[in-house]
Swiss-Prot record:
PANTHER family: TRIOSEPHOSPHATE ISOMERASE. The keyword Kinase does not apply. Its EC number is 5.3.1.1. Homodimer. The keyword Transmembrane helix does not apply. Involved in the gluconeogenesis. Catalyzes stereospecifically the conversion of dihydroxyacetone phosphate (DHAP) to D-glyceraldehyde-3-phosphate (G3P). It comes from Halorhodospira halophila (strain DSM 244 / SL1) (Ectothiorhodospira halophila (strain DSM 244 / SL1)). It is found in: Cytoplasm. GO terms for molecular function: triose-phosphate isomerase activity. GO terms for biological process: gluconeogenesis; glyceraldehyde-3-phosphate biosynthetic process; glycerol catabolic process; glycolytic process. This is Triosephosphate isomerase. It is an enzyme of class 5 (isomerase).
Length: 249
C-alpha cells in the first residue's frame, strides 16, 4: 500500500512565527502518513532546525543547473545541504507566470533526482484545455517530457502532483471523481512508459485546493495518495486536520 503524503506549499508566504507555529503543531503529527513543509528559501534554515523529527522539509523550486553564473538560482545540491528532502518542480504558477515549458521542467526534475532529492512533479491542464477535452493530451505530454529526459525508471522514488488549474480561481470545482479520473490516467501513463511496479508504488498527490472539509472524500479515492496543500498549509490547525484525514484513511 502506498503511504500517503501531505505536503504544504507556502508559496511566497510565511515568516519565522509561522515556522514556529507549524513546527509546534507538527509535533502532534504521529501517524502512518508523511508530512512535509515547503517554505520559501529564506525560511528553510529555520524550518530545518525547528521541524520535529519525521517531518520532511522541501523547497518550492530548483535550478536545472548545478552551479555557475545564474544569478538568483538555487541548485539541487544546495537544497540538499540545507536539509531538504523534497522539491516541487513544474508548479502551474511557474509554468504560467515564468514561462517554464516542459523541457525546462524536465531539466529541473533531472537535476533534483541526480542530487538525491525527491522531486514532486506538478502536472495539470488549464480551463481552456479542459473545455477542449485535451486533459489527457496535455498531462500526457507533461509526463512524457520528463520520461523522455530521464529514460527508464523515471519515477522511481519520485512523486507526482495533479493540479487541476481549470478549477483554481475560476469558480469551478473538481469533484473527487473528476480528480480520480486524472490520477488514474497518470498512473496508467507511467505504467505504459516506465514500469508497472513503479506506477503501482508512485504517490500521486492532489493539488486542487484540498481543505480540511473535503480532504477525507478526496483521499478516499483509490489513486489519490495525498495532497499538495496551498492556502490551508498556512493555517497550522487546518494543515494538521488534513494530515489527520490522511493518517486515518
Amino acid at each position: 500500500m502506498r503511504r500517503k503524503i501531505i505536503a504544504g506549499n507556502w508559496k511566497m508566504n510565511g515568516d519565522q512565527d509561522l515556522v514556529r507555529r507549524v513546527a509546534e503543531r507538527a509535533a502532534d503529527s504521529a501517524g502512518d502518513a508523511e508530512l512535509a513543509v515547503c517554505p520559501p528559501y529564506p525560511l528553510l534554515a529555520a524550518a530545518a532546525s525547528q521541524l520535529p523529527f519525521g517531518v520532511a522539509l522541501g523547497a518550492q523550486d530548483v535550478s536545472e543547473y548545478d552551479s555557475g553564473a545564474y544569478t538568483g538560482e538555487v541548485s539541487a545540491s544546495m537544497l540538499l545541504e540545507a536539509g531538504c528532502r523534497y522539491v516541487i518542480v513544474g508548479h502551474s504558477e511557474r509554468r504560467t507566470l515564468y514561462g517554464e515549458d516542459n523541457g525546462r521542467v524536465a531539466g529541473k526534475f533531472v537535476a533534483a533526482r541526480n542530487a538525491g532529492l525527491t522531486p514532486i512533479l506538478c502536472v495539470g491542464e488549464t480551463l481552456a484545455e479542459r473545455d477542449a477535452e485535451r486533459t489527457e493530451s496535455v498531462v500526457g505530454e507533461q509526463l512524457d517530457a520528463v520520461m523522455d529526459a530521464v529514460g527508464g525508471a523515471t519515477f522511481q522514488g519520485a512523486v507526482i502532483a495533479y493540479e487541476p488549474v481549470w478549477a483554481i480561481g475560476t469558480g469551478r470545482t473538481a469533484t473527487p471523481e473528476q480528480a480520480q479520473a486524472v490520477h488514474a490516467f497518470i498512473r496508467q501513463r507511467v505504467q505504459e512508459r516506465d514500469a508497472g511496479e513503479i506506477a503501482d508504488q508512485l504517490p500521486i498527490l492532489y493539488g486542487g485546493s484540498m481543505k480540511a472539509d473535503n480532504a477525507a472524500e478526496l483521499l478516499a479515492q483509490p489513486d489519490i495518495d495525498g495532497g499538495l496543500i496551498g492556502g490551508a498549509s498556512l493555517d497550522p490547525d487546518s494543515f494538521l486536520s488534513i494530515y489527520n484525514a490522511a493518517a486515518e484513511g
